Regions:
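Long terminal accessory regions outside catalytic cores
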Residues: 1-100
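Non-catalytic propeptide/linker segments at domain boundaries
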Residues: 63, 77-135, 140-143
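Soluble non-cytosolic domains of exported or imported proteins
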Residues: 67, 150-158, 186-190, 240-248, ...
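Solvent-exposed loop/turn segments at secondary-structure junctions
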Residues: 137-140, 180-184, 212-217, 239-242, ...
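Catalytic-core regions of hydrolytic enzymes
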Residues: 142-222
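A short, glycine/acidic-enriched catalytic loop
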Residues: 216-242, 250
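Active-site-adjacent substrate-binding region
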Residues: 242-268
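Active-site-adjacent mobile loop/cap segments within catalytic or ligand-binding domains
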Residues: 267-316
């Protein structure tokens, strides 16, 4: 009888122990942060955007990029801002410094260029290689395709084609990678990293990841030589050991563009992440136009940008 009673107590003990363990597991699961869904950190998949204003309420930027505290932005006017607060689709930035992107760049050293070709530049591009790819292959332009994304291959690949063609015409050897990195989610940059590593085996002068932004059309529109053109924004990853080298290269491009094609550059955005720029000191991400625009105006922007790149790298 005593043995039977002991066994009963033993079973009750183990039953209670299992119950406590089950409850503990459920509570721990509920309180453990869950992995973010791809869409939580996705950028530019649609037409949503963040509006950034300065401390006086002036509009300084609208972008589909993820905007986080401590991100920095050098505006078209070379005003350097730092983001101090983000609240949903609104952000606040304070002025950090007034920069001078053109410091040290003599106007005498810059070529006079015309549409799509720097005809007065003594080119030293022969034998120089460049690489182009697209992390977000599906990005498109609504005025051309009726939608902001067209998987697997959107209008953005044709923007890359226009840029590659212009650079080749200017004397560069260009590899335009069209590897598919879909879907447009948080892992797209991990997939495109393999493409970047592959392209870098040829040791190019620079490598460019070509995108389009999400913002109102007016935020990316300009006119150059009487031609409606999409503006270009350079994006730098600030979680990146090559950030200083990447930023210096970006400043060279912006300063040169400001001289030969005023209004082309929208600015330089330094966001959280690395955008695979840790792989190379001359790795840049270009936002060419916005989803609300068209392939035509984006292609104009890409060709003008190619002239600027030629002016910078053609004089090395």
């Amino acid at each position: 009888m005593e043995s039977s009673t002991n066994r009963r107590y033993l079973w009750i003990f183990f039953g209670l122990l299992l119950g406590v363990m089950a409850i503990s597991y459920i509570v721990n699961t509920m309180n453990t942060p869950q992995p973010a869904k791809p869409g939580d950190f996705d950028d530019q998949a649609g037409t949503a955007y963040v509006t950034v204003r300065d401390t006086e309420g002036n509009l300084i930027l609208q972008t589909g990029l993820p905007v986080t505290v401590n991100d920095e932005y050098i505006s078209a006017e070379d005003i350097h801002y730092i983001v101090i607060r983000v609240d949903g689709d609104k952000a606040l930035a304070r002025r950090k410094t007034q920069t001078n992107a053109q410091a040290g760049i003599s106007s005498d050293s810059l070529p006079a260029v015309t549409l799509h070709y720097p005809n007065n530049l003594i080119l030293r591009t022969a034998g120089k290689k460049l690489a182009i790819y697209h992390t977000h292959n599906d990005e498109s332009y609504i005025l051309t395709s009726g939608k902001s994304a067209e998987p697997p291959d959107g209008d953005i690949l044709k923007v890359g084609d226009a840029m590659a063609e212009a650079l080749r015409r200017n004397g560069f050897t260009v590899v335009h990678k069209k590897n598919n990195h879909n879907p447009h989610d948080i892992n797209a940059y991990s997939r495109s990293r393999r493409t970047s590593v592959q392209a870098l085996k040829d040791t190019p002068e620079a490598i460019f990841d070509i995108h389009r932004d999400s913002a109102p059309l007016s935020a990316y529109m300009t006119t150059i030589n009487g031609v409606e053109t999409a503006q270009v924004m350079i994006v730098i990853g600030r979680s990146n050991p090559n950030m200083n080298a990447n930023l210096e290269f970006a400043r060279q491009i912006k300063a040169t563009a400001d001289k030969i094609y005023p209004g082309l550059m929208r600015g330089i955005y330094m966001g959280r992440g690395d955008y695979n720029q840790d792989l190379y000191p001359r790795a840049l991400l270009f936002e060419i136009g916005t989803a609300e625009g068209s392939l035509t105006i984006a292609s104009h922007g890409a060709r003008y940008l190619s002239d600027v790149i030629t002016a910078v790298l053609g004089q090395d």
